[in-house]
Amino acid sequence: PRRGDAGRATVDGTIKASPDEQFWFGQFRMGLWPKFYDNSAFASQKDLNSFWRQMTPNTGPYNDKVIADAVTDALKKSEGTVLVTHSQGCGPGWLIGTEAGNNLKGIIAFEPGSGFIFPEGKVPAPIPNNSFFGPTKAVGVPLSEFKKLTRFPILIVYGDNIPKTEVKNPYQDYWRAASTMAQEFVKAVNAEGGHAKVLHLPDVGIKGNTH
C-alpha cells in the first residue's frame, strides 16, 4: 500500500520533485556517482536509465503495519507460501511472520536495512555508522509474538561491497551496520529455537550484486 502498483492511497501524501539519483546510486551500492564499482554486475548506463524510470515514490505515509496487514490478509487465501521480501519491505515481512499463521512456510529476505524486531528487553543497542540515516536501530515486540518467527525457516541474503568493519563511505557503512543487526536478529531467532541464517553472496563465490 502507498507505493508502486498499490499506489492509490486512501490517505493524503505529498511527492517532492527532488533529483536524488546520485544518492540512490550510492545507497544501492552500484558505485560512487557516476562510476560503478569495478566488480559491479549492474549491466550498463543504458540499463541504469531504465532502472531510474521504474522507481516510484511513496504516495502516502510509509506504515509497516498497514503493509503487513494487507499481505497477511492475502496469505490467508493461500495453502502455503514462502514470503520473499526486499529492502524496506523486509520490516513488514517480520510483522507478517508474526501474524500469518500456518499459511506461511518461510521467509527469504533480500537485504533488509531496517525494521528488525527483537523480544522486548533484548533489543540490541543502536549500531553507529557513517550513513545519512543515523544509527541502525531495532524495535521490541512481546516474546510471544517474536517466537512466532521460529515456526519456519528464515534466510537473509546480502550482496557485494558490504564491508566487515567501519568505513568512511556512508553508503557501504550503512549496509555494514544493517548486516550486523541482521546477524543479531538471526541469533535472537535461533536462541528461541528458530532456524534463521544470514548469507553473504560473496562468501559463496557470487560477486558483484548490488542492493
Segment roles from a protein language model:
Residues 2-62:
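Cap/lid segment of the alpha/beta-hydrolase catalytic domain
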Residues 95-99:
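Active-site signature of alpha/beta-hydrolase-fold catalytic machinery across serine-
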